[in-house]
């Protein structure tokens, strides 16, 4: 994939340095002298600032605790995966054949990392304001209703309220394992009900994995 025009159109930004967008789209499995991990590191910090400032201005009466919860619900793997899919980012990523055959183009972790890298690349070339314009536009397109109730949802609390009402029990959370290097660990958590596993999920922290697993469990119990 050497034609990035459609991706740039969706971003509403054209890279002057094409090597920068190539690096942002290169997964480490592709075995080039470069990959997108450094740009991902930068993009993660840039997005944290952009979303933090956006929420600070949007909710002038909300305290730090509420703002942190809302930001955490947007600035995470599932949140960035949603934005990546909005611009069909998976179609442009450079992957190894093994990763390609392992459905790598649709992996949340891979999509999320590539999105962070793209924003990091935009920031390097065009600055914070342009990175902000792109990020906020996509954020608002994917979340037409950004408000306290819809974005500060605590899935663990919601699951507990549901299971206590319907089963008279409190859900449990069991650590199944962790993988990856120390600076980039991924944790797997299982939600149990009456000692039976009802959902599992992975996340960048134990809390993140618990929230994801609780969300999956909620959806399953409501069917």
Curated annotation (Swiss-Prot):
Entry's EC annotation: 3.1.26.3
Main location as per UniProt: cytoplasm
UniProt keyword Cell division present: no
Gene3D superfamilies hit by this protein: 3.30.160.20, Ribonuclease III domain
Pfam families for this protein: dsrm (PF00035), Ribonucleas_3_3 (PF14622)
Keyword presence, Nucleotide-binding: no
Necessary cofactors: Mg(2+)
Domain DRBM: 154-223
Active-site residues, Swiss-Prot/TrEMBL: 44, 116
Binding locations of Mg(2+): 40, 113, 116
Domain RNase III: 4-127
Molecular-function GO term, any one: metal ion binding
One BP term from GO: mRNA processing
This protein's UniProt keywords: Cytoplasm, Endonuclease, Hydrolase, Magnesium, Metal-binding, mRNA processing, Nuclease, RNA-binding, rRNA processing, rRNA-binding, tRNA processing
Localization per Swiss-Prot or TrEMBL: Cytoplasm
Family indicated by similarity: Belongs to the ribonuclease III family.
Subunit structure: Homodimer.
Name of the protein: Ribonuclease 3
Record organism: Sulfurovum sp. (strain NBC37-1)
């Amino acid at each position: 994939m050497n034609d990035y025009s459609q991706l740039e159109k969706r971003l509403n930004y054209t890279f002057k340095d094409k090597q920068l967008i190539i690096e942002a789209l290169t997964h480490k499995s592709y075995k080039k002298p470069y990959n997108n991990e450094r740009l991902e590191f930068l993009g993660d910090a840039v997005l944290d600032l952009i979303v933090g400032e956006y929420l600070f201005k949007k909710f002038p009466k909300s305290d730090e605790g509420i703002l942190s919860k809302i930001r955490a619900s947007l600035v995470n793997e599932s949140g960035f995966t949603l934005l990546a899919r909005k611009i069909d980012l998976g179609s442009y990523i450079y992957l190894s054949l093994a990763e390609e055959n392992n459905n790598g183009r649709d992996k949340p972790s891979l999509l999320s990392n590539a999105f962070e890298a793209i924003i990091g690349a935009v920031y390097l070339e065009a600055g914070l304001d342009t990175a902000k314009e792109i990020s906020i536009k996509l954020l608002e397109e994917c979340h037409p209703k950004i408000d306290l109730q819809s974005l500060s949802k605590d899935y663990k609390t919601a699951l507990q309220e549901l299971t206590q009402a319907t089963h008279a029990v409190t859900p449990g959370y069991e650590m199944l394992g962790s993988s990856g290097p120390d600076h980039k660990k991924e944790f797997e958590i299982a939600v149990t009900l009456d000692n039976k596993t009802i959902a599992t999920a992975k996340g960048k922290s134990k809390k993140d994995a618990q929230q994801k697993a609780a969300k999956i469990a909620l959806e399953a119990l409501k069917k």
